[in-house]
Amino acid sequence: MTDPNKMIINLALFGMTQSGKSSAGNILLGSTDFHSSFAPCSVTTCCSLGRSCHLHSFMRRGGLEVALQVQVLDTPGYPHSRLSKKYVKQEVKEALAHHFGQGGLHLALLVQRADVPFCGQEVTDPVQMIQELLGHAWMNYTAILFTHAEKIEEAGLTEDKYLHEASDTLKTLLNSIQHKYVFQYKKGKSLNEQRMKILERIMEFIKENCYQVLTFK
């Protein structure tokens, strides 16, 4: 029986090598579950699931205070420096079915560095994988998480100005996913403050989608 005082949200991270997926996953979990480091090659080679502690009184739903638990699936970079596209895609497909086959996926987060232009085949490869794995309704279950957003401030840009000057490819994608995006900053904010801000934004997306989930076989 579902506990009305608790809610679990299931998230999956997608993105290119060195986009900051594992680091973003650790912020979402409030832990260091995922190995994250700078390297000239892909670091993550297999999917892994992390679970956060309960965030008590995170939100109110139906007049009740609800504790939130976050489950995050970290995936290998795509394209990968050592693994074939076919292998990575199959690995992620099996992980989605294993971890979210019954509970379902609330949101796929496309992790994209804010200081890397969104253009060319490499940046669209992860989007294509999301489309193939999530199916025709992928737009309703996908958001963009921009990492290294402090680079935007360093360049003297606001978030709105940054998006206004973005590539047509990024603008088209944002239109497709109903402008679901969130920025992650490394400087000037505590990890907990970042985490809460990002989770609040993610919960807005999930609520707008009526708490629906995608299930996998």
Curated annotation (Swiss-Prot):
Keywords: GTP-binding, Nucleotide-binding. GTP binds at G15, M16, T17, Q18, S19, G20, K21, S22, S23, S36, H148, A149, E150. GO terms for molecular function: GTP binding. It holds the Pfam family AIG1. Residues 6-217 form the AIG1-type G domain. It comes from the Eukaryota. Belongs to the TRAFAC class TrmE-Era-EngA-EngB-Septin-like GTPase superfamily. AIG1/Toc34/Toc159-like paraseptin GTPase family. IAN subfamily. This is GTPase IMAP family member GIMD1.
